[in-house]
Amino acid sequence: METPLEKALTTMVTTFHKYSGREGSKLTLSRKELKELIKKELCLGEMKESSIDDLMKSLDKNSDQEIDFKEYSVFLTMLCMAYNDFFLEDNK
């Protein structure tokens, strides 16, 4: 039986691959694919084009104009840290 944490990890991996490869490599997210993933999978509200550009620049460590799985994982880690901070503040 899959534990809640294992299910969460599976969801993170399958979500990446659900959007990757629609344009170009199956192993990376293009700017358009990243934008669609954020819009459909996260409740971050409507993001400005400049915000998407800034996010791409900050995540794209190898400057290839695509987000690979490692870069995507860093993004998820940053989100987890922000969620944790929110819950810590909410419990004060």
UniProtKB/Swiss-Prot annotation:
Pfam families named among the record's database cross-references: S_100
One GO MF term attached to the UniProt entry: calcium ion binding
SMART domains: EFh, S_100
Keyword Cytoplasm annotated: no
Residues binding Ca(2+) 2: 60, 62, 64, 66, 71
Residue ranges occupied by any EF-hand domain in the UniProt entry: 12-47, 47-82
InterPro entries named among the record's database cross-references: EF-hand-dom_pair, EF_Hand_1_Ca_BS, EF_hand_dom, S-100_dom, S100/CaBP7/8-like_CS, S100_Ca-bd_sub
Entry binding sites for Ca(2+) 1: 28, 33
Keywords recorded for this protein, A-Z: Calcium, Copper, Metal-binding, Repeat, Zinc
Record's GO cellular component terms: neuronal cell body; nucleus
Entries under PROSITE patterns matching the protein: EF_HAND_1, EF_HAND_2, S100_CABP
CDD domains, sorted: S-100 (cd00213)
Subunit composition and interactions: Homodimer.
Function: Binds calcium, zinc and copper. One subunit can simultaneously bind 2 calcium ions or 2 copper ions plus 1 zinc ion. Calcium and copper ions compete for the same binding sites.
Official protein name in the record: Protein S100-A5
